[in-house]
């Protein structure tokens, strides 16, 4: 694994319980790379072990962000036991803000969009030069076009 190339998957607050599809697929793909991968979230929001893989799970968000090169914020509902599909915490301390970004390695901020501003991430972070959410969205368009082209070619 590369040194200092760290990607953090951060569970941010959200008013509704959202599925774990994006966090699970992101974790699965990150585990196939040579990046150090850390998942941070409040206790009770664990992802399925088969997707967490070799990722480090850190419940202290500030500790997880230390020295990170990329921050990818996303929200998801609880997975395990009687709490399945529930929102266990709406703690705004988990909103990605300058406070957390200051301890990173000048990390790039990512989110799959659309995003609830000032709930998932503050305006200061998403509007900063370190935010790459628009190029990220543009890449999704290209990826979808390529997949559609391949599907149509196979008909």
Regions of interest found by a model, annotated:
Residues 1-8:
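Short, small-residue-biased leader/transition segments that mark boundaries at the very start
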Residues 9-73:
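Glycine-rich phosphate/diphosphate-binding loop of Rossmann-like nucleotide-binding domains
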Residues 50-124:
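Rossmann-like adenosine-cofactor binding region
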Residues 14, 85-89, 135:
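Conserved short-loop catalytic and cofactor-binding motifs
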Residues 20, 24, 58, 95, ...:
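Electropositive phosphate-/nucleotide-binding environments in soluble metabolic enzymes
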Residues 4, 34, 67-68, 106, ...:
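Short, well-ordered alpha-helix to beta-strand connector turns
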């Amino acid at each position: 694994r590369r040194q200092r190339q760290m990607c953090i998957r951060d569970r941010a607050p959200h008013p509704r319980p959202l599925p774990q599809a994006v966090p699970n697929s992101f974790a699965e793909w990150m585990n196939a790379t040579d990046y150090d991968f850390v998942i941070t979230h409040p206790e009770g929001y664990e992802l399925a072990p088969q997707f967490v893989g070799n990722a480090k799970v850190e419940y202290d968000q500030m500790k997880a962000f230390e020295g990170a090169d990329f921050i990818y914020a996303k929200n998801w509902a609880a997975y395990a036991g009687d709490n399945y599909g529930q929102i266990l915490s709406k703690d705004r301390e988990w909103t990605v803000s300058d406070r957390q970004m200051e301890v990173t390695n000048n990390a790039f901020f990512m989110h799959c969009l659309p995003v609830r501003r000032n709930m998932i991430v503050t305006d200061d972070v998403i509007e900063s030069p370190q935010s790459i959410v628009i190029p990220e969205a543009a890449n999704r368009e290209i990826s979808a076009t390529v997949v559609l082209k391949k599907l149509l070619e196979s008909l």
